[in-house]
Amino acid sequence: MKDIVIVDCIRTPMGRSKNGVFRHTRAEDLSAALMKGLLERNPEVDPEELEDIYWGCVQQTLEQGFNIARNSALIAGIPHKVAGVTVNRLCGSSMQALHDATRAIMNGDGDIFMAGGVEHMGHVPMTHGIDFHPGMNKSVAKASGSMGMTAELLSRKFGITREQQDEFGARSHRKAHEATVEGRFAKEIYAMNGHNADGELVRVTEDEVIRPETTAEGLSQLRPVFDPANGTVTAGTSSALSDGAAAMLVMSADKAKELGLTPRVKIRSMAVAGCDPSIMGYGPVPATEKALKRAGVSIDDIDVVELNEAFAAQSLPVLKGLKLFDKMEEKVNLNGGAIALGHPLGCSGARISTTLINLMEEKDAKLGLATMCIGLGQGIATVFERV
């Protein structure tokens, strides 16, 4: 079987969705900038040799509609012969895009692909135009459509306290701020044009969403959002709303060698799994178990983990389920996570994978795991290996 490698990966800074730096920047422009950026950073790759572009996006309407993968590629000046398709597995869309590209290369359907994703949650709200079939209530708990309520249920099921959630939320901001100050995000962030609070055009080089002043004590003062009477999940322990994109250059190891490119990681294994929609946030556990089995390794063999922080109330049960709860400080989300950086739905899978790859290099780690929950009860996971 062919080895599939990632030779480069970048992301935009994460912009705040409400009046943020990308309020005048469209989702296609965020995407196109990264597509162009990958090619500029890797001149050994002839754009004509790109087979296809797999691009994750959840809310495929308004500026994100009508196949944003193709639209963005045309804006980026990618040759017309290169195809593009938009992928939707909700929160796992851009990781699914990576999986699709990987499988295509394995099957001999091309040698070089781009995979990534975007979500501009400021321009296209998460719930825009959603109309669930009423018949779903016969087989799925009504609250399954509320991600926050599923997190509440999961926290109760696993005995996660409000205090633990507040500390986890504060940790995310603290570690993301440290990563910013120490320059650890610099290698993965691709600078973008945006607008400051006064409307002036500026070059954006850092994430806008991180709140370095956040403390567990401060978070403890916030009221529960989804279950005001009995809940524990607050806005401060939920993933922030943000705008962003991430992109990866994926190819066969043989092609990378032919072009003289140095692979950063190879795809060791991939998996998706379903779970009860009422505890949708637990999806990373069965997905990771599948991926580990396919890679022939155990969770103890994994050196670094990126778990998408949809909610603290969701992340902590997953860490318990994966036996990582007591290894959090040494392995998990060492540069913070989505509570601090935000969760632009179609972008996040490629974003956490990009952050993971950079962490693996920084830590000289051999194996890394990126995994995330998916609305309505799914999980997705990828095991990466340094080469």
Swiss-Prot record:
<feature type="active site" description="Proton acceptor">
    <location>
        <position position="373"/>
    </location>
</feature>
<dbReference type="InterPro" id="IPR020610">
    <property type="entry name" value="Thiolase_AS"/>
</dbReference>
<comment type="pathway">
    <text>Lipid metabolism; fatty acid beta-oxidation.</text>
</comment>
<dbReference type="GO" id="GO:0010124">
    <property type="term" value="P:phenylacetate catabolic process"/>
</dbReference>
<keyword id="KW-0443">Lipid metabolism</keyword>
<dbReference type="InterPro" id="IPR002155">
    <property type="entry name" value="Thiolase"/>
</dbReference>
<feature type="active site" description="Proton acceptor">
    <location>
        <position position="343"/>
    </location>
</feature>
<dbReference type="GO" id="GO:0005737">
    <property type="term" value="C:cytoplasm"/>
</dbReference>
<keyword id="KW-0963">Cytoplasm</keyword>
<keyword id="KW-0808">Transferase</keyword>
<keyword id="KW-0276">Fatty acid metabolism</keyword>
<dbReference type="Pfam" id="PF02803">
    <property type="entry name" value="Thiolase_C"/>
</dbReference>
<dbReference type="InterPro" id="IPR020617">
    <property type="entry name" value="Thiolase_C"/>
</dbReference>
<keyword id="KW-0442">Lipid degradation</keyword>
<dbReference type="InterPro" id="IPR020616">
    <property type="entry name" value="Thiolase_N"/>
</dbReference>
<feature type="active site" description="Acyl-thioester intermediate">
    <location>
        <position position="91"/>
    </location>
</feature>
<dbReference type="InterPro" id="IPR050215">
    <property type="entry name" value="Thiolase-like_sf_Thiolase"/>
</dbReference>
<comment type="subunit">
    <text>Heterotetramer of two alpha chains (FadB) and two beta chains (FadA).</text>
</comment>
<comment type="function">
    <text>Catalyzes the final step of fatty acid oxidation in which acetyl-CoA is released and the CoA ester of a fatty acid two carbons shorter is formed.</text>
</comment>
<dbReference type="GO" id="GO:0006635">
    <property type="term" value="P:fatty acid beta-oxidation"/>
</dbReference>
<dbReference type="InterPro" id="IPR016039">
    <property type="entry name" value="Thiolase-like"/>
</dbReference>
<dbReference type="GO" id="GO:0003988">
    <property type="term" value="F:acetyl-CoA C-acyltransferase activity"/>
</dbReference>
<protein>
    <recommendedName>
        <fullName>3-ketoacyl-CoA thiolase</fullName>
        <ecNumber>2.3.1.16</ecNumber>
    </recommendedName>
</protein>
<dbReference type="InterPro" id="IPR020615">
    <property type="entry name" value="Thiolase_acyl_enz_int_AS"/>
</dbReference>
<dbReference type="InterPro" id="IPR012805">
    <property type="entry name" value="FadA"/>
</dbReference>
<comment type="similarity">
    <text>Belongs to the thiolase-like superfamily. Thiolase family.</text>
</comment>
<keyword id="KW-0012">Acyltransferase</keyword>
<dbReference type="Pfam" id="PF00108">
    <property type="entry name" value="Thiolase_N"/>
</dbReference>
<dbReference type="InterPro" id="IPR020613">
    <property type="entry name" value="Thiolase_CS"/>
</dbReference>
